[in-house]
Design a protein with these regions (language model features):
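Bacterial Sec-dependent N-terminal signal peptides
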Residues: 1-20
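OB-fold single-stranded nucleic acid-binding module
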Residues: 19-121
Length: 121
């Protein structure tokens, strides 16, 4: 059973890395495509009471953000991770690159990513 779980994790990791794994500097080139973005979590805004959206800024903090991971509280439960534990870590985020239509800064984002994996040190 342990080998089966280990095999699954390896296959999942290979799947993320075998796709286009890009840095935040290249996200604009992959608009509306599903990719795996690598970068360091430098700041975040967690949903306050009455709010339901969390923002994780990768490589540069807000307001100089170059890429943001946006996760709703409901969806966060399916990812099974604590956002606070990601601060300062390098992560792989898999999902579709989009831009929120009402964002005046037009910052690329992944909304409710398929997966977030912390890079092993």
């Amino acid at each position: 059973m342990k080998n089966l779980v280990l095999s699954f994790l390896i296959i999942f990791s290979i799947n993320c890395f075998s796709q286009d794994t890009i840095t935040t500097a290249k996200v604009n080139e992959y608009m509306d495509k599903e990719v795996c973005v690598i970068g360091k979590v430098v700041s975040m805004k967690l949903a306050s009471e009455g709010k339901s959206t969390n923002y994780i800024n990768i490589d540069k903090p807000y307001p100089e953000s170059v890429f943001t991971v946006v996760i709703s509280n409901r969806y966060l439960e399916t990812l099974n991770l604590k956002l606070e534990d990601l601060m300062g870590k390098i992560i792989y985020t898999k999902g579709k690159i989009t831009i929120y239509k009402n964002d005046p800064k037009q910052i690329p984002q992944i909304f409710n990513p398929i997966s977030i994996v912390v890079k092993k040190e």
